Amino acid sequence: MTFIEKNTSFPAPRNDLVRATRPGKVDAYPQDWIHAAQELAQEFAQAAVQRDLEGARPVDQIRRLRESGFVSLLYPKNLGGGGGTLHDAAQSVLEIAKVDGSTAALLGFNYYNSLVPLLTDYTGANDAVVRHAADNRFFWGNVTQYVNKEFVAQHHPDGGYTITGTKKWNTGAPLAEITTLLAIHPDQDRYIYAVIPTAREGLEFHNDWDPIGLRGTDSGTITFHNVRIFPEEVLNWGHSPAQTGPLPLWASFGAIFYTAVFIGRTLGALEQVREWVLRGRRQGSFGGVSVSADDPFIQAEFAEYWVQVQ
């Protein structure tokens, strides 16, 4: 029995893969997030390339992110979170991206979306959602693309909404137990944000994501078939005027986490090249050297790449 099954009445996961991401234990939050991320990266490096070649989903890696508390890093301590900083979060994504781009991207999107209840209202009206997420170490999915203009909610006679439509590029949602949800209000003059379980009846996951290098991010298409959104699942919007565009700081946070993934992947690639060169020997002597690492042309080229990254 997992930690969540012992401590919550949250709906059962939609499949065995999602269930396998549930934490079997709950570690204390790290005192040094970046050092802890480096240790996790060493774990994740095992067979990361093979997982991507096979298109295997990073189930065990998400479970470890939940057990270690990284999924709740940005939540305040008084709400049960890790109390980490934005720098801690971005650097953790970067460290993991050096060895496992898919898992790093999923962690970045988790941070991106775990902040939604805090960004939609600064008065604490959504604190219960944050506490629930922190208590359960939830990994967050993402169903928030603004480009799907036909994704319009309809009023439900008992309150809340129903939604029928399709959303593309839903990073992490297939392996998450909860996800943010962005839809156009029935009046079509503003957006609504909600948080729903991915086991909700009417959700169809298409599993159509297959890009080289980031196959494990699970950013596929989801179709909603008359999916119910209950009133208590709709996040409070505490700003004026009504939400007609992206959340406050949304683009900035996205840029930070995307950049962390890109830089981490680049640093990881350079490290792999360095290791290959250090191990390599030439069949003959060129330019007076027989070891590749001693070749001044290779040294100059590597130095140029390194400077560009910096």
Name what the model sees in each region.
Residues T2-Y29:
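Intrinsic disorder at enzyme termini
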Residues L40-A48:
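N-terminal capping segment at the start of a domain
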Residues V49-D52, Q310:
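C-terminal helix-coil-helix/basic helical segment that borders enzyme active sites and/or dimer interfaces
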Residues R57-E67, S72-T171:
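Glycine-rich flavin
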Residues V147, L175-E177, R190, D208, ...:
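A generic structural signal for well-ordered coil/turn residues at beta-strand boundaries
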Residues D158-T162, I178, S219:
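A generic structural signal for beta-strand entry/edge sites
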Residues T166-F205:
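A short core secondary-structure module
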Residues I212-Q308:
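Glycine-rich beta->alpha junctions and the first turn(s) of the following alpha-helix
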